[in-house]
């Protein structure tokens, strides 16, 4: 089983959350949806793989650019965990939007998480998040060992 971290993190908050979740996973290949030089349609995820897909929520939705790029990846029935990262306000329909895109791209959504990170514009909101306690909870929330034990 290969592990992927598919993320869009223009200000670094989403990347911190994703890193906390995958810190105890075996070697993780990162697909950076903010890259302007990547052909996302060239990615074919192996069916026995696990992907963490993390995006920020702006105005209750994921950035359309991130959704459009994620939609180009061939999920090939690989399992995925979705993460909507928000700045202590709300994440609205971000996870639904991400799940719809993941399903259309061929992924099997097995879990979804909302996580707080420091607000990207008004830094006083959720300042310093994710903090050490957040990271501990995030790491435990999607344990690679737990996911492997429940493969079907």
Language-model features, listed with the residues they occupy:
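A short, Lys/Arg-enriched amphipathic alpha-helix followed by its capping loop at the start of a domain
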Residues: 20-27
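Extreme N-terminal starter segment of soluble prokaryotic enzymes
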Residues: 1-4
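Conserved anion/nucleotide-ligand pocket segment
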Residues: 130-134
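A contiguous pocket-lining binding segment that forms or flanks enzyme active sites
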Residues: 137-143
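A short acidic, helix-capping loop that chelates divalent metal ions and anchors anionic groups
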Residues: 119-125
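Conserved small/polar residues in nucleotide/adenosyl-binding loops
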Residues: 145-152
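Short N-terminal binding/cap micro-motifs at the start of the first secondary-structure element
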Residues: 12-18
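Helix-loop-strand module that forms the ligand-binding subsite of alpha/beta enzymes
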Residues: 34-117
């Amino acid at each position: 089983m290969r592990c992927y971290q598919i993320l869009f993190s223009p200000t670094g908050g989403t990347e911190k959350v994703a890193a906390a979740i995958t810190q105890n996973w075996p070697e993780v290949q990162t697909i950076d949806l903010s890259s302007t030089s990547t052909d996302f349609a060239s990615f074919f995820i192996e069916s026995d793989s696990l992907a963490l897909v993390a995006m920020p929520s702006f105005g209750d939705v994921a950035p359309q650019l991130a959704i459009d790029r994620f939609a180009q990846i061939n999920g090939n029935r690989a399992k995925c965990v979705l993460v909507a990262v928000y700045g202590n306000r709300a994440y609205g329909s971000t996870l639904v939007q991400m799940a719809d895109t993941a399903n259309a791209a061929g992924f099997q959504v097995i879990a979804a998480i909302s996580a707080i990170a420091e607000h990207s514009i008004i830094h006083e909101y959720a300042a310093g998040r994710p903090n050490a306690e957040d990271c501990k909870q995030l790491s435990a929330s999607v344990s690679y060992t737990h996911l492997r034990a429940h493969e079907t």
